[in-house]
């Protein structure tokens, strides 16, 4: 039977049954054949030199494609397993796969795990295997044959049990692995790889399963790719908020308390407190009423809201109080704010009604997903909900967006994009079941963005279960996209909770609920800022804004303490370093701690009623009158800037008044 193959340009050609991607590619051009590594048939990756199974749309994947790099790294993971099996015959394997920036394989050994010190030996074994350039042979095993092949490996046996029949794999010499993924046709192109690290990972990501050892590596088509990767990893380490948080004593996580439950040290708590006060003041000035609501609620509240049906896997188990009452740690704040709205009969005169809270929430995150402050189990969300009449939606949307842009300006967040997040039309069961609501709300959201003439892109499958949203995607310090802010239209929860207001006509009407987050959770926002600023926070955010150093405690400490008193009275955060250490050591430590201003006082400064000031990152000091320095620092803090000048408010201008 002939194969009808459709190419990306729309042309359809017939090929005999048994044709491979390799044969088709070689028939197109030799230059393409030199770069090709796999195919994609109807969107699924297929091996380069295996027979094409059926007719369909075919793309040739080359070394220039992201999928080509994925195939390279999947092959590297396979060779890693082969090398480990050769070095440690008793080793058991979990799963290995390519990642966005490399590959890994999960392993387990009864006689001691592989350590970081062993990685050079493992890599040499991989390089020796690659040098032999033995053929990678695709194999097909029956379920019985697969059980026999992996009879001594408990984790592979579980994978076989869950797989279909027959089972695909690859063979390299005497090594066979159960492998559904596509690998390179040969090992000759696998020249540039490096093993990187070792970490723990629960089998299949479940904390109830055994902890395996995950060995990480990366691979590229060229040595330059490997060198560039090393530079990126070094840069990532320098920006890593977990490392900076440790060095600047911002936060820590204690395993005796539990993963994903950070402790805020005084320095980190100061940054958080400044941000929280800033946010609250900003929201109150914008018409929000701040509230406090319980972190616990009756489970029925979340059944009514739909969280229990659509979000249960991310919620902690309910607490049975023994008298029929079931309490739940809240995963979101919106049902609580609905209770605030419902506490009184509402009139159209009260709308828009804006409610905000720095609300603590809890999410059932798996241990393997937790990371510093970015992924935690307890978090505090800068949350807000506005209840509006239908004809107020567009103006309120604009008002919220103006507030977000104003906050971004104060934090100097400039690299962001707008994403309209819709439900997945092919997977509607995971969303609230009301097609009319989805059509209307998605249309309103798109209309508001079009009216503002702002560029945006659309993404299906990214909506909340109860409605579409605008996600503002910011670039992290390493160039990755991260959702910072959201605005969501919600027709569902007002319906579920029977929310009403009395209109001008004296009749009851249903409000629209707008969910919005300005900066997300305090935890993730501070992680983001720590990495963007590389720990060198602007003066208004810095835990310690200035450190005062007397040259001689006996002669200059009294003057330094008078300056400190003035600065504290002006609302500044200042410390005195009067330790019995060398001056150079104290100055270097202040720079290491990234304190914005190091202020030195000696005889000359004492006589001139002045101070010598060194800004963080500068190599020189400047003498200033003590009062002038304090006034300039107050102005800098007041205006959220480094130079004390009032900023123009360009972001607000873009969106109008």
Curated annotation (Swiss-Prot):
Nucleotide-binding keyword on record: yes
Pfam families assigned: HGTP_anticodon, TGS, tRNA-synt_2b
Location of this chain's protein in the cell: Cytoplasm
GO cellular component, one term: cytoplasm
Free-text remark on how the cofactor is bound: Binds 1 zinc ion per subunit.
Chain ranges of the TGS domain: 1-62
UniProt GO molecular function: ATP binding; catalytic activity, acting on a protein; metal ion binding; threonine-tRNA ligase activity; transferase activity; tRNA binding
Signal peptide annotation: none
GO biological process: threonyl-tRNA aminoacylation
CC cofactor: Zn(2+)
Entries under InterPro entries matching the protein: aa-tRNA-synt_IIb, aa-tRNA-synth_II, aa-tRNA-synth_II/BPL/LPL, Anticodon-bd, Anticodon-bd_dom_sf, Beta-grasp_dom_sf, TGS, TGS-like
Superkingdom of origin organism: Bacteria
Cysteine-cysteine disulfides: none
Enzyme class: ligase
Main location: cytoplasm
Keyword Ion transport: no
The reaction(s) this protein catalyses: tRNA(Thr) + L-threonine + ATP = L-threonyl-tRNA(Thr) + AMP + diphosphate + H(+)
Alphabetic keyword roster: Aminoacyl-tRNA synthetase, ATP-binding, Cytoplasm, Ligase, Metal-binding, Nucleotide-binding, Protein biosynthesis, RNA-binding, tRNA-binding, Zinc
Region (Catalytic): 240-538
UniProt-listed Enzyme Commission number(s): 6.1.1.3
Function according to Swiss-Prot or TrEMBL: Catalyzes the attachment of threonine to tRNA(Thr) in a two-step reaction: L-threonine is first activated by ATP to form Thr-AMP and then transferred to the acceptor end of tRNA(Thr). Also edits incorrectly charged L-seryl-tRNA(Thr).
Self-association state and partner proteins as the record states: Homodimer.
Family (UniProt): Belongs to the class-II aminoacyl-tRNA synthetase family.
The name this protein goes by in its record: Threonine--tRNA ligase
Native source organism of the sequence: Lacticaseibacillus casei (strain BL23)
Gene from which the chain derives: thrS
């Amino acid at each position: 039977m002939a194969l009808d193959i459709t190419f990306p340009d729309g042309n359809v050609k017939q090929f005999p049954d048994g044709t491979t991607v390799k044969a088709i590619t070689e028939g197109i051009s030799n230059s393409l054949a030199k770069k090709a590594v796999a195919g994609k048939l109807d969107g699924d990756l297929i091996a380069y030199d295996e027979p094409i199974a059926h007719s369909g749309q075919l793309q040739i994947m080359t070394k220039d494609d992201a999928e080509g790099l994925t195939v390279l790294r999947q092959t590297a993971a396979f060779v890693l397993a082969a090398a480990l099996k050769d070095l440690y015959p008793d080793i058991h394997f979990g799963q290995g796969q390519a990642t966005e920036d490399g590959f890994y394989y999960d392993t387990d050994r009864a006689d001691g795990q592989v350590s970081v010190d062993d990685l050079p030996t493992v890599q040499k074994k991989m390089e020796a295997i690659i040098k032999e350039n033995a053929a990678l042979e695709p194999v097909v095993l029956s379920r019985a044959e697969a059980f026999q092949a992996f009879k001594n490996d408990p984790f592979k046996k579980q994978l076989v049990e869950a797989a279909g029949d027959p089972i695909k794999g690859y063979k390299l010499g005497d090594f066979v692995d159960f492998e559904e993924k596509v690998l390179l046709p040969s090992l000759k192109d696998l020249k540039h790889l490096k093993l990187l690290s070792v970490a723990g990972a629960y089998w299949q990501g479940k904390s109830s399963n055994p902890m395996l050892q995950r060995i990480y590596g990366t691979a590229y088509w060229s040595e330059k790719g490997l060198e560039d990767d090393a530079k990126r990893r070094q840069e990532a380490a320098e920006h890593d908020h977990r490392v900076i948080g440790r060095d600047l004593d911002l936060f820590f996580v204690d395993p005796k308390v539990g993963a994903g439950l950070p402790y805020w040290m005084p320095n980190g708590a100061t940054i958080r407190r400044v941000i929280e006060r800033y946010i609250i003041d900003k929201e109150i000035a914008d018409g929000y009423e701040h509230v406090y609501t319980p972190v616990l609620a009756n489970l029925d509240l979340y059944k009514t809201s739909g969280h229990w049906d659509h979000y249960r896997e991310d919620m902690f188990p309910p607490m049975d109080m023994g008298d029929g009452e079931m309490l739940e740690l809240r995963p979101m704040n919106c049902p609580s704010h609905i209770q605030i709205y419902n506490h009184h009969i509402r009139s159209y005169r009260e709308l828009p009604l804006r409610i905000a809270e720095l609300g603590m929430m809890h999410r059932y995150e798996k241990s393997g997903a937790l990371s510093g402050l970015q992924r935690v189990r307890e978090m505090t969300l800068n949350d807000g909900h506005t209840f509006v009449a239908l004809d107020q939606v567009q103006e309120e949307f604009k008002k919220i967006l103006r507030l977000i842009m104003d906050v971004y300006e104060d934090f100097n967040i400039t690299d962001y994009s707008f994403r309209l997040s819709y439900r997945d039309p092919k997977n509607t069961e995971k969303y609230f079941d009301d097609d009319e609501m989805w059509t209307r709300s998605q249309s309103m959201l798109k209309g508001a963005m079009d009216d503002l003439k702002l560029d945006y892109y659309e993404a299906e499958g990214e909506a909340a279960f109860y409605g579409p949203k605008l996600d503002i995607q910011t670039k992290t310090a390493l160039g990755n996209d991260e959702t910072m802010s959201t605005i969501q239209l919600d027709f569902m929860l007002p319906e579920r909770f029977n929310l009403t207001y009395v209109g001008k006509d004296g009749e009851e009407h249903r409000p629209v609920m707008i969910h919005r987050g300005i900066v997300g959770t305090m935890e993730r926002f501070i992680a983001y800022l720590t990495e963007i600023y590389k720990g060198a926070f602007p003066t208004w955010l810095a835990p310690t804004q200035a450190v005062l150093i007397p040259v001689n405690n006996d002669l200059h400490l009294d003057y330094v303490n008078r300056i400190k008193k003035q600065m504290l009275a002006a609302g500044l955060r200042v410390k005195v370093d009067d330790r019995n250490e060398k001056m150079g050591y104290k100055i270097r430590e202040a720079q290491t701690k990234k304190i914005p201003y190091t202020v030195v006082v000696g005889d000359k400064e004492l006589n001139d009623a002045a101070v010598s000031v060194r800004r963080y990152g500068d190599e020189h000091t400047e003498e200033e009158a003590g009062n002038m320095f304090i006034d300039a620092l107050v102005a800098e803090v007041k205006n959220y800037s480094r130079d004390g000048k009032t900023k123009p408010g360009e972001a607000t201008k873009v969106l109008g008044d």
